Design a protein with these regions (language model features):
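A short, amphipathic edge element
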Residues: 19-26, 83-87
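Alpha-helical membrane-targeting segments
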Residues: 1-23, 45, 49
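Hydrophobic beta-strand-centered segment that forms part of the acyl-chain substrate-binding groove
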Residues: 69-111
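Short, charged, low-hydrophobicity "junction" segments
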Residues: 8-15, 39-45, 74-85
């Protein structure tokens, strides 16, 4: 499935409400009830002086994958819930010197929490 329109919708919403996410230009690769995958390109916007990705961009990607899964679940259940993150945990395995793929596979746990 092509997620071009979902990526464009994400850019439109974030441009207005959360501009820093829009600035990073995330692209949705896969989004369903179980997991979310997105890519953030390494370019002049996201690259630091040592030609690797800023840690803040890593945080945006990690936060956004879980957030998209949660928003999808909330929307599907037609719940009126405001999404506020208390904290999150992410593992960064090495320095990013190219585009980065972010994956969240916690769809079942998120579904359980939204109930």
């Amino acid at each position: 499935m092509n997620y071009f329109f979902e990526s464009m919708k994400l850019r439109m919403v974030t441009w207005w409400q959360i501009p820093v996410i829009c600035y990073c230009r995330p692209q949705i690769i896969h989004l369903d009830d179980e997991y979310c995958t997105l890519r953030i390109p390494l370019n002049w916007r996201t690259r630091n002086h040592v030609r690797s990705m800023y840690i803040g961009v890593f945080t945006v990607g990690a936060d956004l994958t879980g957030g998209l899964l949660t928003l999808t679940t909330i929307h599907k259940r037609k719940r009126k819930v405001v999404l506020i993150f208390k904290d999150f945990h992410a593992n960064f395995f090495k320095r990013a010197e190219e585009d980065v793929i972010f994956i969240c596979r916690d769809g079942a746990a998120i579904d359980q929490a939204v109930q």
